[in-house]
Amino acid sequence: MTATSERITVSMSEGVADVRLVRVDKMNALDAPMFNALVDTAERLRTEKGLRAVVLSGEGRAFCAGLDMGRFAAMNDGTSDLRDLAKRTHGLANHSQQAVWGWRQLPVPVIAAVHGVAFGGGFQLAIGADMRFLAPDTRMSVTEIKWGLVPDMAGTPILARLVRDDILRDLAFTGRIFSAQEAMSYGLATRICDDPRTEALAAAREIAGKNPDAIRGIKRMLNGLGGDPGPALLAESVEQMKVMGTPNQIEAVRANIEKRAPKFADGSN
């Protein structure tokens, strides 16, 4: 399989799919075409004959900077498309969740090669992989609270399996930026390496040389641990719908755009 779009390129070699985000001018930020490309690419790879492993990376200065700023501007001026996030369009997930969850559903291991920044949705995309190889200068953040939102894109059920509960709460409540070294200490980084893509491709080729039936069986077993993720995915959507478009959420966006401290009313939910 070789595929090229305005957002993602895919090349196959020796059973390894090299998937790259290529919206370089926007640090691979997530707009509607990028969401669609992530969902569609994962779906096509699920049935790719001979697939043994996947490496997911970003071209340019960053892995993925998160949600496109144009979407936050739409929240500010009231033109945001507030769809019914609770609608399950892809099994357990809605469309934006599937951009991450689809990589969890692949029957083969996925390695994220991360450099630069992985913020918000970009962070969720990274943790949607089975393993994460980080460059030493990588910075990460659960950024949603900065914009008055709750973590989404399947981040909460995945994070709950990866880190301690208090670490999860710290990152989600504060939205603070943390380093590759901190990510390693939290259990969010598999390796820290100078050239994460090269090392990830080497690891993927090593995996591709193992019994593919056993590899797929291992992933099925590990994905089955921890219970049904469906309720957590739905709760994530419901809570997001409660805050999107509210005065406090719009104030968070405006304050960030205007580079000032927000002025929130007392919480109502």
What does each model-found stretch correspond to?
Residues 1-59:
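Conserved CoA-thioester-binding segment of acyl-CoA-metabolizing enzymes
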Residues 1-5, 254-269:
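Terminal low-complexity tails and localization/encapsulation signals of metabolic enzymes
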Residues 58-99, 118:
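Glycine- (often His-adjacent) and acidic-residue-rich active-site loop
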Residues 98-107, 113, 119-173, 186, ...:
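CoA-thioester-processing core
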Residues 175-182:
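Acidic, divalent-metal-coordinating active-site segment for phosphoryl/phosphodiester hydrolysis
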